[in-house]
């Protein structure tokens, strides 16, 4: 991943796994894609200078795909009333043995810094709103669409419009 003038480039999950490297946002997106593939309800958590992942424990979504209200997230992580489980994804690569419970503790600790909270992205709500995943690369000549169909790269290129009209 690289920093741009505004934002940051994010590696696709297959690149993170293939290259065995990634920034916090790369790891959060990869983990969220694994949660979604398992039928769970991922949240990508973004705070100033860092990203990590969460998961809704109940089958429901927020009203919008981007949640910038800290209290809407925080109140769902209170012990005994937990609807969201947070995970520090960089713990999976820290080089030392960090178990899942500790990664969850570190994920929850990230939320204790309300001043630096930017937003959470509710992936399930985004899907309900029509946002689809980027097709995943199978090999250099074919990709798999979000619906599981496999097509050659040339098929996707042929289907792309020759020119986009904006405005």
Annotate each PLM feature.
Residues 1-167:
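A structural boundary/capping signal
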């Amino acid at each position: 991943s690289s920093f741009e003038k505004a934002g940051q480039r994010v590696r696709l999950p297959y690149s993170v796994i293939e290259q065995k490297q990634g920034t916090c946002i790369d790891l959060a997106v990869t983990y969220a894609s694994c949660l979604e593939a398992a039928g769970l309800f991922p949240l990508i958590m973004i705070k100033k200078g860092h990203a990590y992942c969460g998961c809704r424990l109940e089958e429901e979504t927020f009203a919008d795909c981007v949640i910038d209200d800290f209290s809407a997230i925080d109140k769902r992580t209170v012990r005994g009333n937990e609807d969201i489980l947070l995970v520090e994804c960089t713990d999976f690569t820290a080089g030392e043995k960090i178990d899942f419970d500790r990664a969850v503790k570190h994920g929850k600790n990230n939320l204790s810094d309300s001043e630096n909270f930017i937003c959470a992205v509710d992936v399930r709500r985004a899907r309900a709103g029509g946002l689809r995943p980027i097709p995943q690369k199978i090999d250099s000549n074919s990709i798999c669409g979000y619906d599981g169909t496999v097509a050659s790269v040339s098929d996707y290129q042929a289907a792309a419009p020759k020119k986009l009209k904006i405005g």
